Amino acid sequence: MKRTHILPGGQLTLSIDRADLPPDELFALGARANPRRAFLFVSKVLGKHWPVTTATLARIHQMLAAKLPAALPAPVLFIGMAETATALAQGVFEAWLAQHPQQEALYLHTSRLRVAGAAVLPFEESHSHAAQQWLHLPIDAENRRRFSTARSLVLIDDELSTGNTFRALAAALTPHLPALQETHWLCLTDFSPPTSAAPPCHSLLRGQWHYRASGKAPLTPPVRERAITIADSGHGRLGIRHALQLSEACFADSTIKAGERVLVLGSGEYLHPPAVYARELAQRCGADIYLQSSTRSPALVWGAISHKRRFADPYDAGVPYYLYNVPPDHRYDHIHICHEHPANTALRESAAALSAKLIQLT
């Protein structure tokens, strides 16, 4: 299947070679204010720019986990990429654990933020609007053991364009993984060029794209991010060996009724704990729960993006965040904004603007 799309800044030709699901179920097209790449594939199954149900999330996680070889040498190290793929990757990790309960494994995700007291491996994401990110090295003794003795490495992102980010991360990891035998790449959509040098790549869709700019792409003004450190919340930056469980206190004050429409919002890269919260909420109250997140991604109002608003920087790092496709006339009965640290002024203001409830997950 081959289609050509006219975007605000140019022309995109998209060829789909293989798809496990109809492409229209996986993504739609958007445009963004980024001269490195002026378009984006707006995922319909991630819970970032587009709301997704918890049932859809679970289905996608299980499909991707099942694509990995059945007999990966253990310990298996799973790494998810910030900002966009943190919930996808941790969901895949948990689905894989359920499929292989006897295997030793460890999950980590990269971060745009520094955790206080933890050593990091820096690397760059070449096409991103926020190129710098870090992988934190585990502190817990058992997590360190599984990390340093890992024999299989699984790198997970939502989309693969060139493979350069995975290569940069793998190069940074090489001195720390002396026992490594196998590497696998896992993603929703694989648009990387075919190369014999790449590890096995498992995806739900394989294709190619070619973009021809027709003029200068809109440019987002550069942001001077403040150098801050955060406390670790124990949800993945420093490693986790099991499926995430939230405390009962997170659900103690719920007044949601069966049949109501509820939007659960994550904050930037903090999305998997809100996904777990959304799943638990759906099971407990029988409401129609949708998941989405604020994001640093500077998209334009075009195509799959029908509405855009500035949103809280939950970490006070001076970074603009955005929330997409939640217009003033939205049809949700409740909105819950989930966050990992005590709410700052910006989060309280965003909650007030949406008449939303703030939930600190523990």
Regions found by a protein language model. Give the residues of each.
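PRPP-associated nucleotide enzymes
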Residues: M1-T362
